[in-house]
Amino acid sequence: MRASRNPRGTRTAPATVLLALAALSATPVRPAAAQTYAQKTTAAVDYILVHSERESMMQVPMCDGVRLSATILFPKDRPRQNIPTVLIFIPYLTEGTIRGGLFSGFIRSFIENGYAVMIENVRGRYFSEGTYTYLVGSGNDGYDTIDWIAKQPWSNGKVGTIGCSSSAEEQHKMNAARHPAHAAAVPMGSGAGIGKVGPYNEMGNFYRGGAVQGVWFSWYYGAGYKYHPTWPANLTREQMLRVSKFWNMEPELMPRPNLDSAVWTLPINKIMHNLGAMPSDMDDFVNRLPNDPKWKAIEFGAEGDRSGAPTLYINSWYDLSIGPNVAMFDYQTKNAATETARNNIFMVVAPTLHCNQGQVETEHTVVGERDMGDARYDYVGLVQRWFDHWLKGADNGVTKEPKVRAYMMGENQWKTYDTWPPKNIDLVPYYLDSDGSANSALGNGRLTTTKPAKATSDAFVYDPMHPVPSLGGQICCFAVNPGGSFDQAGLEMRNDVLVYTTPTLTERVDVVGNIEVSLYLASNVKDTDLTIKLVDVGPDGKAFNLDEGILRVRWREGWEKPVFMESGKVYKVDIPPLVTSNSFAAGHRIRVEVSSSSFPHFDRNLNTGGNNYDEKDPVIARNVIHHGPAYPSRIVLPIVRSVSTKTAQ
């Protein structure tokens, strides 16, 4: 995702930018907690400053004549010859990349091991020429940059790429461009750079299930602006070095936005105006529907893009893009351009937030409110061995390790798999059932592996002016909606939330992989949203969210054209799959929540059947979920076969 920035102008990297520069690497060794994260960062920065030589304001020419600005860090006291290079291609400040976030730990390791590190700004950002438009040109610019590096007299002709969030998203098209010098890639939390892949088509996470993700109003206000002060064309490097001593091109005084009230603005295409935001792509994006042909101009990584470089994906269960990220791993495993690339697609999935890996883990890693146990992991070690193998030819066994290493929440252990989804799973349907009143956790909603014999239904009212509040989840960089796993028990007291729960489990149930969702809906309106949330309920009643999904019902038949509902008619609605890895322990219960809103994580459907983005007068929806023999509303859980699926009856 495009990481956010601190609205207070500073000359250090904003906190949320540091989040986006943090997720990197993995081996099963858990590092000792002798130093805090802040201490390790300080030590890494000190090492970089002492042991590297910096070449700033390098002007890298693109094929269209635009020059991109780059800083190169060389290992000190070593000959500048036959050097492998790691490229970080970013829209953020170079100094923030070096001094903040886990990138400092990676850069230190690269310098220690004899690598050059090149940090280059994408076009239109800071001292790079051109106009910033998200991901437009990333494939060509990435190819040209790798070509430039490979031709330098100090290069060994091999380039690795690494990044989290924006600097990972840029790698999709770069990898698909298949420059022969692009030897290995490490994209982390890169879903905002993904278009159509597998069951997902989120236009780079702008949408989920056709609903706008609220985080983008925050990100485009603080980081995604299109214009900035610029300089005369064709300044020399020496002139740019002099200029850069006086300006760093970062806004000094950015007014703090009142997001708490702004997110309630209707129509939503007035939110950026009301915030007083600088012009950005958001001014255009917010006025598009998912089937707008203009989305095709953005260079999302998608089906048809076949990676040329071996790729190590690093993701997290509470990343806003976890579904597309996992789907991209699966796609490239089957479709990468060469046998070498296909056989060397690896993935690590942590239990943390977007780009948080390596920053928050302790013996008791808390994500939101849930203790995930000891989730520490040597990310730097794995990435270093990955690049040593592919850029230096080291025979270190890194490619002989399991293809997937994913953290199982609940059990709080790292697990390894040869494939994803794992082979030893059974797809087990869990059916929604009730006595006609599943409203709130006090209702009679049931979740059962037995298909209901009796037709029943549950009705609720969705009022867009009183939506269900978002609480945690797969979200990033959005102050009004922190991400992670939170106790949902309070929200489950609302009558506009349908709650379906299993009996208490007598034995553990391990759920690993994609979770299919099919609901049968009738409504009095032409269009509405359906939301679903998977929850782990402990013996103490705390109900921790695992993943959630949404679908704007007009898109239930695909993204080509909307199909509206007729009042009272029952429709099958397949929500894009959820994905998780969680062990439901004996004594716990599996729960599903169904509603029509999760705000401000997703924009509110005004239920009119109109564009939604330019409307301000909502219609109240009376939505009915049907279940029974003719309408088997259900979720399908991927359950590990070696663990019993029995529940108390």
Across the structure, where does each feature detected by a protein language model lie?
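Short beta-strand/loop motif that positions the catalytic acidic residue
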Residues: 313-315
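Short glycine-enriched nucleophile-adjacent loop
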Residues: 168-179
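Alpha/beta-hydrolase fold nucleophile elbow
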Residues: 154-165
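Active-site-adjacent alpha-helix of alpha/beta-hydrolase-fold enzymes
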Residues: 323-345
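Accessory cap/linker subdomain of secreted extracellular hydrolases
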Residues: 112, 176-178, 184-306
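C-terminal, loop-rich substrate-recognition/catalytic regions characterized by aromatic stacking residues
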Residues: 235-270, 357, 362-649
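N-terminal cap/lid segment of alpha/beta-hydrolase-fold proteins
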Residues: 41-78, 501, 505-507
